[in-house]
Amino acid sequence: ADRNISKEYQIFIESFASEWLRVLKPGASCFIFAGRRLAHRVIIAFEDAGFVFKDMIGWNKKNAMLKAQQISKVYERRKDLENSEKYKEWRVGNLRPVFEPILWFIKPYKIGGTISDNMIENGIGAYNLEKWKKYSPKGNNYIEIQSLASDKGKHPTQKPLELMKALIELSTQ
């Protein structure tokens, strides 16, 4: 495995995080879908750019596929039947990825101000709990939305329209 992938990914994120901070209004939310293995690098890059890490929302995708390889198959191809049997329940890779972290950042509002003041000035900064409860009934940082056939598009990691709507309603008027 390439041990530099994580650091290279952080450098990539750093290449645009500052620009996002520049164009957003104070108090604006920014949601990043980050893989479980690299979410920490996104958090570091965005904090270093000046964002505030507000929360992590857990999205239960429900229908994620297990892609972990059975190690016994490797031994079978090697004609090593003893180890194939010995390790038949063992896998290489990750668990079924039903959880995807959604990282929630905000652009800081002006020093000396408050979120209440920022809401009046920019219309953003707080969140709408009642709208969020339509998607996460207990109002917590966990959401279950399944991809529909109509959500499939040209991007390999396209997200469900309902999920995007939930995030928009959470953070904007």
Tell me what each language-model feature is.
Residues 1-13, 17-21, 31-32, 37-173:
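Class I S-adenosyl-L-methionine
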Residues 28:
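Glycine-centered, small-residue-biased loops immediately flanking beta-strands
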